[in-house]
Amino acid sequence: MELRDLQIFQSVADQGSVSSAAKELNYVQSNVTTRIKQLENELKTPLFYRHKRGMTLTAEGRKMLVYVNKILQDVDELKQVFLDSETPSGILKIGTVETVSTLPTILSSYYKSYPNVDLSLQAGLTEELIREVLDHQLDGAFISGPIKHPLIEQYDVSTEKLMLVTQNKAFHIEEFTTTPLLVFNQGCGYRSKLERWLKDEGLLPKRIMEFNILETILNSVALGLGITLVPQSAVHHLSKAGKVHCHAIPEKYGSISTVFIRRKDSYMTNSMRSFLKTIEEHHHINML
């Protein structure tokens, strides 16, 4: 078993097919297929299910992936320890939820100060970003927090006011039972706050419609499709234009914190240390 075999296994697991993995790694497909078969023979167990749509991990394959991710992360960190220079450089893989109002300022400031760092940004929901940080797929991520996890350390980024957004100027709480809720998929912090509020009020929403893009949610509200709950900064432009109306909600549910997370046991590169310093410089509380 060679390090290259583990890299091939990880790529096939992530991409879901031999052809996509071969393209990502710049290998011929037959080489990838052979390496996977050799790995399965060596471990005496099938690691993938083969089907028309590609390949998915078996239970043993999922177990294998946990170890492979850790091994390859350790190898990367070993390289970083010896190659890390005083001047931040290299690749920094960062995840983020879609509504971090301070993110453009943080990224712009960081890039101007450390132009040799290649920032890779990936959008996602809080729960999936936590998982990807734990799996070493991301160096860190901006999520809705705070959270408690023994393997994660977190840094305050911002606190914002949450607003209920509707098409109509007037709103009554009973409308939750007659109007669809427009939300992100499960794993979104704003959705969790909204669902907790409704549960405490004993209200059952008429319908929940899930979206992947914030602007689609807000534009749908503006067209009268439903109502949503988002940070005030995310809807300010539409509210100012009179296309939607914002309503305060009970204080218990009315704010959301954004935190930056990373694995506690990850090697602290100069690039990451400088990124955390930049976050600290731009930390703010926006509750106006």
Curated annotation (Swiss-Prot):
Residues 1-58 form the HTH lysR-type domain. The keyword Transcription applies. CDD domains: PBP2_YofA_SoxR_like. The keyword Transcription applies. One of its GO terms (molecular function) is transcription cis-regulatory region binding. InterPro entries: LysR_subst-bd, Tscrpt_reg_HTH_LysR, WH-like_DNA-bd_sf, WH_DNA-bd_sf. Residues 18-37 bind DNA. It holds the Pfam family LysR_substrate. Keywords: DNA-binding, Transcription, Transcription regulation. SUPFAM superfamilies: Periplasmic binding protein-like II, Winged helix' DNA-binding domain. Belongs to the LysR transcriptional regulatory family. This is HTH-type transcriptional regulator CzcR. It comes from Bacillus thuringiensis subsp. konkukian (strain 97-27). The gene is czcR.
